[in-house]
A protein has these predicted regions:
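Alpha-helix capping and helix-loop boundary segments enriched in small/acidic/polar residues
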Residues: 32-36, 83, 87, 100, ...
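Peri-membrane helix termini and adjoining interfacial loops of integral membrane proteins
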Residues: 64, 104-109, 196-204, 244-250
C-alpha cells in the first residue's frame, strides 16, 4: 500500500482531479466556455505533472487530453504538436550539434580561452575566461550534452592546476560550470528548449509577432553577459574562496599539448554549423536591403537550416565514415523528453 502513495502517484491523481474539476464546471463560469475551462484544467494539470513527475511521458497525457477537446480532435492535436516547425527545429538542432560534442571542439575552445596571456595574469582572470569559454560553447550545444562533455575536462584542469576537489575554489569552479551551462541555454535557441518554446509561444499569442533567431540572440546574449558578470562578482565578493591565490595559472599552458590539431572531420562539422547559423541570422541582417531573400528564407521556417545541416552531415563522409551517424545521434544526441514536452507545451499554449 505504501507504494501507492508515492509523490508520483499522488501528483498524477491530483492532475486528473484538476482536469475533472474544470471539466465539471458549468458553461460560462468566469465568462468562459466549457471547452475553455477544460483547456485551463489541462494546463494546470500539465504543470503539476511536469514539476512533480517528469517532462517526458506525462506530456503524452497532456496531448491525449487535448485530443479529446471537441474543437481539436486527435488529428489536429498531432498536427499542432509533432507536426509544428518548433518541434522539428528542436529535433534537427539536437541531431545537428551532437557530432560537435564528439570532437575536441569543447576542449579546444576552452584551452584557447584559458591559456591566453590575459587569462594567465592571475586566478580571477583565469576564472573569468574559463566561465566565458563555457558560456560561449553553451550557445551552440544543449546543456545536458555539454555538461557530460565538459566534466572530464574540468577534472583535467583540476589536476594540471593542483586544485583539490571539495576545496572552496574547486566547488566554485564546479558551481560556476553548472551555472554558466544553464545560463547559456537561455541565450540562444540553438539546441535549447526554453528559448524555442518562448519564441513559439510569442509567435502564436494574440500579438502574433514572430521572433527570429537573430532577434532573440540580440537580446539574449547581452542579457546573458550581464548575468555572467554578476555571477563572477558574487563569487569574488560574497563567496570569496580563500584558497584561490594558490592557483598557478602559468601551468594552464600545459593543457595546450593535451589535444591534437583539428582534423578535416571537425573542420567540416564546424563549417556546416557556421552555414546553419548564417542561414538563421542573415535574413534579419539584410531584411531591408534584400527583402526577397528575407521572405524566401523566413518562409522556410527556422527548421530548414538545421535540416539542411543534418542532410549535409549524413551525406559527407571521410574514410567511409559519415560526419553524422543517424542511429547514434538519435539515441544519444536527442533529448526526447524535451521534444515531448515542447510538443505538449506548444500545443497547450496554442489551445489557451
Amino acid at each position: 500500500m505504501k507504494n501507492l502513495f508515492t509523490k508520483r502517484n499522488i501528483s498524477l491523481l491530483v492532475s486528473m482531479l484538476v482536469i475533472l474539476f474544470f471539466y465539471l464546471l458549468p458553461d460560462m463560469t468566469w465568462g468562459l466556455s466549457h471547452e475553455a475551462l477544460w483547456a485551463i484544467g489541462i494546463f494546470f494539470a500539465s504543470l503539476i505533472m511536469w514539476i512533480n513527475v517528469s517532462i517526458d511521458w506525462p506530456s503524452l497525457i497532456s496531448l491525449f487530453m487535448i485530443g479529446l477537446l471537441p474543437s481539436y480532435g486527435f488529428n489536429k492535436m498531432l498536427q499542432g504538436s509533432f507536426g509544428n516547425s518548433t518541434v522539428a527545429f528542436l529535433l534537427f538542432t539536437f541531431i545537428l550539434v551532437y557530432p560537435l560534442s564528439q570532437t575536441n571542439f569543447v576542449r579546444r575552445i576552452t584551452i584557447a580561452f584559458i591559456t591566453n596571456k590575459v587569462a594567465r595574469k592571475g586566478p580571477w582572470h583565469f576564472v573569468c575566461f574559463l566561465f566565458g569559454a563555457i558560456t560561449f560553447i553553451g550557445l551552440f550545444i544543449s546543456p545536458s550534452v555539454l555538461f557530460v562533455a565538459f566534466l572530464p575536462f574540468l577534472e583535467d584542469i583540476y589536476k594540471v592546476l593542483d586544485i583539490k576537489k571539495g576545496s572552496k575554489t574547486g566547488n566554485m569552479l564546479m558551481m560556476g560550470t553548472a551555472f554558466c551551462i544553464s545560463l547559456s541555454s537561455g541565450m540562444t535557441p540553438i539546441g535549447h528548449v526554453w528559448p524555442t518554446l518562448a519564441m513559439s509561444y510569442f509567435a502564436g499569442s494574440e500579438i502574433g509577432y514572430p521572433i527570429s533567431a537573430f532577434e532573440y540572440m540580440a537580446f539574449g546574449i547581452p542579457t546573458g553577459i550581464v548575468l555572467l558578470v554578476s555571477l563572477i562578482l558574487i563569487f569574488k565578493f560574497i563567496y570569496r574562496p580563500d584558497d584561490i591565490k594558490s592557483i598557478d595559472t602559468a601551468k594552464a599552458i600545459n593543457l595546450r599539448g593535451s589535444i591534437a590539431k583539428a582534423d578535416v572531420r571537425e573542420k567540416a562539422i564546424i563549417a556546416i554549423l557556421v552555414l546553419v547559423v548564417f542561414l538563421w541570422i542573415s535574413p534579419s541582417l539584410v531584411k531591408n536591403a534584400m527583402p526577397e531573400y528575407y521572405a524566401l528564407i523566413n518562409g522556410m521556417t527556422t527548421a530548414m537550416p538545421p535540416l539542411l545541416g543534418c542532410i549535409l552531415m549524413f551525406v559527407i563522409s571521410f574514410d567511409g565514415k559519415p560526419l553524422l551517424n543517424f542511429k547514434e545521434a538519435t539515441t544519444k544526441g536527442v533529448m526526447w523528453g524535451s521534444i515531448l514536452m515542447t510538443a505538449a507545451a506548444t500545443l497547450v499554449g496554442a489551445t489557451l
